Amino acid sequence: MSTHQTQVVIIGGGPSGLLLSQLLHRKGISSIVLEKRTRAHVLGRIRAGVLEHGFVNLMREAGCGARMDREGEIHEGFHIAHQGQLDRIDLAKHTGGDTVMVYGQTEVTRDLYEARDAMSGVVIHEAQNVQPHALTEARPFVTWEQDGEAQRAECDFIVGADGFHGVSRKSIPSDVLKEYEKVYPFGWLGVLSETPPVSEELIYARHERGFALCSLRSRVLSRYYIQVPLTDRVEDWSDAAFWQELKRRLPDEVAAGLQTGPSIEKSIAPLRSFVAEPMRYGNLFLAGDAAHIVPP
């Protein structure tokens, strides 16, 4: 068995884990990131594309914000559609200047990978059977397998940034862990298309047929969602059926300007609200979706 020494082991190589590793490095704290998937798989995942003000500032603090600031689009407001009307909410005005930024999570992850590479950060991919140990002892450790060889990393702290289904939260004893969850009786059918967005700012639409969202990734890449029953399957929805239903849920003036096209990604996301406590057990800390999920 190969043994490694570090200050922090981070389980999960998504945005949360990579950003934490980068922030720790800038404070002189060493870390090892363990990710069970390949880098190509992580960078191929389609995820959210709107970044909150606080996260944008963290990216800058981590020294990873240059491309984000150059290519991302700042939005100072959004629209709410209801009863055929479209009302704009001035986000900057009502928050003292805070805004959101449209910049895909895939690009965030790519920027974080490049930053860790530039600083010779240790990110281990295809780490299988990851398991934290000795969480309440002074020197916890994590074991995993890579290419059939057993590995061990001893550390001061372990961070579980391995998502809702990860091993970290499950390592907290059941008599300590409390979970609060609400599963909603519907999902969001999402389509990604290489078409100009119908609006420069997001549109949240309330309609008797169900919710709809008009979002974007760039000026030539759009992301749209409609609320569907959990019993629906992706194959139940052709592109034509999706566009037709989306138009029904939008005000006429918006629907008239909607440019449709072939989907390049289509999926149904079930929605849940979830919070786990405590977020710390011994020397294990939970971060990101391992600790809490807010739909969508």
Task: Please state what every model-predicted region is.
Residues H4-V8:
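Extreme N-terminal starter segment of soluble prokaryotic enzymes
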Residues E114, G121-L271, V275-R280:
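Conserved FAD-binding catalytic core of PHBH/FMO-like flavoproteins
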Residues I11-R26, S30, L112, V159, ...:
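Conserved mid-domain beta->alpha element of the FAD-binding
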Residues I29, C64, G121:
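Short phosphate-binding/catalytic loops that engage adenosine nucleotides
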Residues R37, F164, A290-A291:
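Conserved Walker B
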Residues H41, D162-G163, V294-P295:
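Glycine-rich, N-terminal phosphate-binding loop of Rossmann-like dinucleotide-binding domains
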Residues G44-A48, E52-D117:
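Active-site-adjacent segment of FAD-dependent monooxygenases/related oxidoreductases
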Residues H25-I46:
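Glycine-rich FAD pyrophosphate-binding loop
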